[in-house]
């Protein structure tokens, strides 16, 4: 990562921006979520709303994300954790129709939180898309909630391969305390 985003406790995957995806429905809910994260010691929060390139253009997504972030930042009380913008990007062929993918990176870094289909295996094609992000766009993929990908959990060599390419694996904290449930593998 290109800065000190990981210094201190950082929440790198949350749906906290109001009204943009399946996370917080409004600013009040977002502020409650931030208060809980702050009480747990979070110093930085990376807002990662879902971006599906087959459903919305990158420009329209960024406009929605930035508007939601502006609302949230205007309501933040003093002493709140630092807010950074990012996205949870569903990787598909449509993503690469954008010439410039730098806006999907976590603010201040070369990393992007990447989501893959839960029902598909990490095929050679999927690996090649990750390689394209790394080699052609200078983006370090952070593979979101890897515990939900049965194909990676069943084939640790595949995960090792992705990490050897330069990918970073992100897990939800519940994995540290419980075994993945069938819901984690849901399509």
What is the predicted role of each segment?
Residues 1-80:
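An N-terminally biased module of ancient metal coordination in phosphate/nucleic-acid-related enzymes
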Residues 10-12, 46-48, 86, 142-144, ...:
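Active-site neighborhood of phospho(di)ester-bond hydrolases with catalytic His/Asp-centered motifs
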Residues 18, 49, 146, 180-182:
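Proline-centered helix-kink/hinge sites
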Residues 23, 92, 121, 185-186:
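A broad, structure-centric signal for solvent-exposed, well-ordered loop/edge residues
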Residues 58-169:
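Extended substrate/RNA-proximal surfaces in nucleic-acid metabolism proteins
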Residues 177-187:
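Single conserved hydrophobic/aromatic residue that forms the stacking wall/gate
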